[in-house]
Design a protein with these regions (language model features):
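Midchain, well-structured core segments that form catalytic/ion-binding scaffolds
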Residues: 103, 127-140, 173-297, 301, ...
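A non-catalytic alpha/beta surface segment that caps or lines the substrate-entry region
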Residues: 23-70, 74-76, 80, 86, ...
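N-terminal capping segment at the start of a domain
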Residues: 2-29, 130-131, 320, 380-381
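Short pre-catalytic strand/loop immediately N-terminal to key active-site residues, enriched for Gly-Thr
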Residues: 132-140, 347-351, 382
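Flexible, glycine/charged-enriched surface loops at secondary-structure junctions
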Residues: 20, 49, 161-166, 249-262, ...
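Active-site metal-coordination/substrate-binding segment of hydrolases
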Residues: 68-166, 171
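His/Asp/Glu-rich mid-to-C-terminal helical/loop segments that flank catalytic regions of hydrolases
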Residues: 234-253, 287-301, 335, 339-342, ...
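Active-site-adjacent substrate-binding region
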Residues: 238-255, 262-264, 311, 321-370
């Protein structure tokens, strides 16, 4: 299974950081470089229908080798890495037989991956880890997923004794900026059901995610010379702070976990004359999600009525919804993945995604798509790492899922 590690190390050398401020598709041209490389690799391992479209979506399939009518099965990962940290000149480091102590990522900058800060790393004592050098993210999210999918499909294609239906492969751009499913052609992809391989911790199996919305708030003020401002000036920064106090502080990300939703302020820029705020709103429950949006609208209304003028403008846009309602209609996709993990001695960790994946959007586009683990930990930053055995096991899980579908 060294093959999956070699692929991963090759892919992380491609800088594929996406850009949320870009209006192009994909948001960065550099994602296309990896996409074109993957196209050649998929052709080399003998897949059919290999293509990359103008938007950067890579698709291919392995034809069925059985007559039996079984669901066409898809596996999907994304090529871009997070805008949160550089993905240029990634320099992976190997930590063999991890001893449970601090890992010095960068001596010069005193960057240390410590179990004091990240206690879950102790689960991997005795294992080989791939870390960053402290200057970039690693890119396991989601180049580990790409490596695992291609390695599994390559193995299946070389072993005709493994019976399987049609297997569809898709690699998307711009997942990290919320646009991964925007131009995904479900009909062209050709699968009945699919899995994203975009999860984190070893054993994760996810089919619930947040309902998500964004809120943009503009607060209008009135600037007057401060020396003569009494009863005239309206400081939009002060009004914005007043608005923020109406949003439950205890429902911020840093105070929530599990199935708890949150309000998260992600940007605040202002002057006396005008202040702009951006929030994201998240909840697993559709009712609580709607309540959260209403609370924000009511907060704006309250302030406008208090001041007797429309100082606060608010625009709320839904982004994606909890895929559970769509997955429940075809629950066998979760049951098969669960069984596959157990059969290759991986303990399934069924937990909600406190975020979103391409699969959430795709599930509402007619392609039910739960999420499988990659094995990566601490995504989007310099403390990202991945145990090599987890990548190898992910390959085994994908192969076993394919086998179980052929038996369905």
């Amino acid at each position: 299974m060294e093959e999956v590690i070699e692929r991963f190390l090759k892919y992380v050398k491609f800088d594929t950081q996406s850009d949320e401020d870009s209006n192009t598709v994909p948001s960065t041209d550099k994602q296309l470089k990896l996409g074109k490389n993957l196209v050649e690799e998929l052709k080399e391992i003998g897949l059919s229908g290999v293509s990359i479209d103008d938007n950067g979506y890579v698709m291919a399939y392995l034809p069925a080798n059985i007559e039996k009518n079984v669901p066409a099965l898809g596996f999907i990962s994304h090529m871009d890495t997070s805008p949160d940290m550089s993905g240029e000149n990634v320099n992976p480091q190997f930590v063999e037989n991890y001893d449970g102590n601090d890992i010095v990522l960068n001596k010069d900058k005193n960057i240390v991956l410590s179990p004091k800060d990240f206690p879950e790393i102790l689960k991997y004592k005795g294992k080989t880890l791939i870390t960053t050098d402290g200057n970039t993210l690693l890119g396991a999210d989601d180049k580990a997923g790409i490596a695992e999918i291609i390695t599994a499909i390559s193995y299946i294609s070389k072993h005709p004794e493994i019976k399987h239906g049609k297997i569809c492969i898709g690699f998307t751009p711009d997942e990290e900026v919320g646009r991964g499913a925007d131009y995904f052609d479900v009909k062209k992809f050709g699968a009945d059901v699919a899995y994203t391989v975009d999860g984190g911790d070893f054993g994760e199996l996810e089919y619930e995610n947040f309902n998500a919305a964004s809120a943009k708030i503009t607060v209008h003020g009135r600037n007057v010379h401060p020396g003569s401002a009494k009863d005239k000036m309206i400081n939009s920064i002060s009004v914005a702070e007043e608005f923020m106090r109406l949003i439950p502080k205890e429902q911020a990300p840093e105070y929530t976990e599990g199935y708890e939703g949150f309000y998260h302020i992600v940007d605040f820029q202002g002057s006396v004359e005008e202040t702009k705020l951006q929030y994201i709103i998240r909840d697993f429950s559709k009712n609580k999600f709607e309540d959260k949006k209403k609370l924000m609208l009511d907060a704006a209304k309250f302030i406008n009525e208090k001041y007797g003028r429309n100082l606060v403008e608010i625009e709320i846009k839904d982004q994606y919804y909890n895929m559970k309602e769509k997955i429940d209609e075809v629950k066998y996709v979760v049951d098969i993945a669960y069984k596959a993990m157990e059969e290759v001695e991986v303990k399934p960790l069924v937990r909600p995604i406190r975020g979103g994946t391409d699969g959430a959007r795709l599930s509402f586009m007619g392609l039910p798509t739960p999420n499988l683990f990659t094995g990566g930990v601490n995504f989007h930053g310099k403390f990202e790492y991945i145990p090599t055995f987890a990548m190898e096991k992910a390959v085994e899980v994908i192969v076993k899922i394919v086998e179980l579908y052929a038996e369905k």
